[in-house]
């Protein structure tokens, strides 16, 4: 697929040379050249580092919701599995929901501004999340975590857009995007380690207060380290689609809320399925609005079949990952009776394996099409989940559990860079924020809604909480189904790419006649 992307870049460059006299505002699909930014080596290292912290802190925030999950729940007066799953789900919900809007705002007002504001917002709501301990309310904590999730929604797409605009397609860009992807498992591990230390040995609110301190430091570094990128004429004339934003966010929030609230109160409660229906209707209205507005949040012209298939794979794979991670933690704590710190230690290979996967992906992207890399990543998600789903409770950690922890990060760090690079190189410069948003939206939203679906399966099959292992295995089997779907779609995408190449090499007779007639 990388060759496909490069060929598209060559094709579009030729088009730019032919149509350079056209007005860029009227032809927004014309890719604009990457701005040349002069930076010293130290400045460039700091810039790449602060951009990668966006992914690091996003996944650290998820780790903070999962590692001390049971300790936080007990301090707030709940041990209900459905309510506990809301801790990570509420965070991932807003991360995935607001990314598209944040990317669009970055395109309009500047990616650097949105990036710095994202860290300031992260700081504020991390502070409040810690103080929610005094409210002794699960709902209060969930709301705080949901509002905290808006911050990574601003960080991720704008960080990726900044990298996409500073670096042209090439080896350096491939390496940087691979490093960006490598921070995902290490960010989760870092968040889990510190939250486990504070929750088990001190006091869990310090997890969030420490995060607030780190975020304000990153905001200051970002303000000085991120280079100034001049807005072009196209960006200055862009406007925000408020109507599309309203229906898009409403639809995504209501659908996700329904799926995650169903396991808590039961699907027989009227407001759960009513909100689900309203959510789907809102998304239908969103699609209709986007087709009619002049400057939509998600331009229909940006999408094609190849991109759609890749995004489906990402959604299926990361839904599988969210289920794998959450229930692995519950399995190790509740059935193998490990402490949060011991579980974190057992998950340490995730970071090492993730780095190896990211570097390998950066190497493979120069030699294989991203569609093939996507197949491998989906297989990694699926195999990792199958291994833990079939692991006996009293089996040694070094058997299936360890292998599962080694294999699964390859799904994370192969799928994210491949999908992000393809979209970043494909779309025009003024849509870099939206391109970055698409992958990040699908990743985080699928984690949240995947947990909701798995939670529904778990609560219906664990015999009202008596048979924990049956509920956990059922959730993992649901995750395996998601992973299998990703494998199938990825394989179909590979075949489709070969068919497309074959058709291009052997044009049919009617096409020749049509071109002859035009001449």
Curated annotation (Swiss-Prot):
Protein name as catalogued: Uncharacterized MFS-type transporter C1683.03c
Annotated transmembrane regions: 37-57, 82-102, 114-134, 146-166, 175-195, 209-229, 240-260, 269-289, 309-329, 337-357, 373-393, 402-422, 434-454, 475-495
Domain of life: Eukaryota
CC per GO annotation: endoplasmic reticulum; membrane; plasma membrane
Protein's cellular compartments: Endoplasmic reticulum; Membrane
Keywords: Endoplasmic reticulum, Membrane, Transmembrane, Transmembrane helix, Transport
UniProt xrefs under InterPro entries: MFS, MFS_dom, MFS_trans_sf
Protein family (similarity comment): Belongs to the major facilitator superfamily.
MF term (GO), any: ammonium channel activity
UniProt record, GO biological process: ammonium transmembrane transport
Residues in the signal sequence: none
PROSITE patterns: MFS
Membrane protein topology class: Multi-pass membrane protein
Disulfide bridge positions per record: none
